[in-house]
Amino acid sequence: MGKLVLVRHGQSQWNLENRFTGWVDVPLSDLGIQEARKAGTLLKGMKFDQAFTSKLQRAQNTLKFILEEIGQKDLPITQDQSLNERHYGALQGLNKKETADKYGDQQVHIWRRSFDVPPPKEKTDLNPEGISESLKDTAARTLPYFNSRILPLVKAGKNILVAAHGNSLRSIIMDLDHMTKEQVLELNLPTAVPVVYDIDASGKILKKQELN
C-alpha cells in the first residue's frame, strides 16, 4: 500500500487580491507561507519517497516549506507543467469583481463553474492563436501525466506528495473518486489542506482523509 498526499498551494498574493491567476507566476502571500508551514506540521511523521509539483512558484514554495517542516528537504522533486493551474486566458490578472462588472455575473459564473466552457483566449506575440482552458481541458493535460508518472509509484507502495493547484488537483480527485462532471464543479479545495489517500496495488482507494 502507498500513500498519495495532494496539497493545494497556500494563499498566493493574487488570491489575496481576488484576481484570476492561472499561469501567472505570483508568489505566496505571508498567510500562504504560514499555511504551507502548517500543512507541513500536519504531515510530520510521514515519510515520503518522492514529490511532484508544477512549474509555478506558489506550488513549488508550498512544497519547499512543507519539506522543511517534515525534515525532508532533500526529497527528490519533479516539476512539470502538466500540474499547472488552469489557464484562465484573458481573465488572468483581472480582479474578479471587475471581471463581473465587465462581462456580467452570469457569464463569469459560467466560465468559472462550467466543466467545458473556457474563458476568452489570451493572445500574445508568442502565441497569436491564444490560450485558455476549461476544467475539461485542464483534466486532459493533468490526468495523463498523473496516471502515467505518479499513480504507478503509489500503486508500487511509494509515499508520494503532490503540491499543485485547485483545478489540476480537482481533475485528479475527480478521477480518483469517480466523480461526475457535475459533482466536481461543487468541489472546492481549501489552500494548503493535505488530502491523504491510502491506495493498494490495484489502485483501489482504501482510505481518504483531509488533515486540518
Predicted regions and their residues:
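GST superfamily/GST-like fold recognition
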Residues: 166-171, 206
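Short catalytic helix/loop segments, enriched in acidic residues and glycine
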Residues: 22-38
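Extreme N-terminal starter segment of soluble prokaryotic enzymes
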Residues: 1-5
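Glycine-rich N-terminal loop/short-helix segment of MobA-like nucleotidyltransferase
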Residues: 12-25
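ANL superfamily AMP-binding
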Residues: 33-46, 145-151
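Phosphate-coordination/substrate-recognition cap region in phosphate-metabolizing enzymes
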Residues: 37-112, 116-121, 174-198, 202-205
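Short beta-strand scaffold positions
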Residues: 53-54, 162-164
